[in-house]
Amino acid sequence: MIVLGSAKERPIGDEICAVAASPRVRNLCGVTTLADVVDLISAAAVAISNDSGLLHVAAATGTHVVAIYGSSSPAFTPPLTPAATVLYRGLDCSPCFARECPLGHLRCLREIAVSEVLDAVWRVFAARERARPHTAQTAEEPIRD
């Protein structure tokens, strides 16, 4: 897993890596170019993103995106791809488009459970596995010179 974002988001990336507690999770926030980000996202099986530029990069590259909307709305800035799972609560107070919750509760994001995000990711993996062509196992031919 790779965590992407700006240099300002590096501490958040560090938190994600700490919670994941795996050497297979890398924080690349602030150390990649835009070209690097496009390459990394296009090679990914799935991208998890808030409503940001990276969400739309993932959509443009054809990578399945799990799009998390809080204070913004998928009605205004949807991922322009059929390969998207949108998580949005549509509360009475949203969309407010504020960077800080004006009501102080941040329910629009807090009510999207981590388990819901992970379920969406696992559904993508399961669909990819079902779509893979399965061939019968055969013994390998001996190598001949």
Predicted segments — roles?
Residues 1-70:
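Donor-binding and catalytic core of enzymes assembling or modifying cell-surface/extracellular glycoconjugates
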Residues 82-145:
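Leloir-type glycosyltransferase catalytic cores
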Residues 36-38, 76-77, 95-97:
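Short, charged, surface-exposed secondary-structure boundary motifs
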Residues 19-20, 41-44, 72, 100-103, ...:
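Alpha-helix boundary/capping residues
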Residues 8, 32, 72, 91-93, ...:
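Residue-level detector of flexible, active-site-proximal loop/helix-junction positions
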Residues 31, 59, 78-80, 95, ...:
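Non-catalytic, surface-exposed connector residues within folded enzymatic/regulatory domains
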